[in-house]
Amino acid sequence: MTRSPLSFEKIENNASFEWAVFVHGAGGSTRTWRRQREDFGAQYNLLLIDLPDHGANAGKAAVSEEYTWDGLADTLWATVDAAGLKQVHLVGLSLGSILVMDMERMQPSRTLSMVLGGAIVKLTPQLRFIANTSLALAKLIGFRSFYKLAARIALPRKNHKKSRDVFVRESQALSIPAFKRWTELYTGLDDHLNMLFMRTTTTPRLLVMGGQDHLFGKQAALYAKRHRHTELDVAPGCGHVVSIEQPQFFNATALAFLKRITRSILQVEAA
């Protein structure tokens, strides 16, 4: 087994289960998924990965001096390889949903399906401006203040507080150089998302969105309408991070989708 570039937690519940790989969002860690472990673990083996500079990777040498979407996706696949896994389901949250789409783009034959929680698939003009000026704004007000501001913009309501608090608390583990590396990545986000938005794929995917996701909800609906092999489920009265704010909805919706995919795979193999 090769050495993994990233820290991960590997949970093999049953040798006959398929594997689901979990990729958290900006400022998070594998702890982000604690509300999913039990429900998903009853039906799947789990690989939970900490992104560079996050969780157990905080304080470690950077995997690269400058992050790129392709480079990060490669690093995630190298981690999957180090865990000894072949074909997997990919589950991504917020920024992790972008990385999951990039992973599938790079190795579609290994991707059984994608679950995209709080999917980021396209930017509004307002978000495009924020992304393009993110580095300058972060330098002006401080990187930690920038992340707190981003949390308040994305999760403004009282019922979003739990998700907002988790985001702010987890992001405290990031060093200032790490904040800078990730913030620099956002300056090219619009062009990258436009490429992903236009790309077609036959890999089944589910977008799980909050009904109160004022930043990304409408774009997710457009994406689901445009692409075949794509499902959209919306949690009423919920913000951007459905897996934290309404974990029962997220888990039930995602597992029902994965069950259908697994059944289809078994039918093809039996034919």
Predicted feature descriptions by range:
Residues 38, 47-91, 252:
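Active-site loop/oxyanion-hole signature of alpha/beta-hydrolase fold enzymes
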Residues 105-106, 111-141:
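Flexible "cap/lid" loop of the alpha/beta hydrolase fold
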Residues 125-127, 144-199:
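Conserved alpha/beta-hydrolase catalytic His-Asp/Glu region
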Residues 184-225:
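Conserved serine/cysteine hydrolase catalytic core
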Residues 238-251:
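Catalytic histidine-centered segment of alpha/beta-hydrolase-like enzymes
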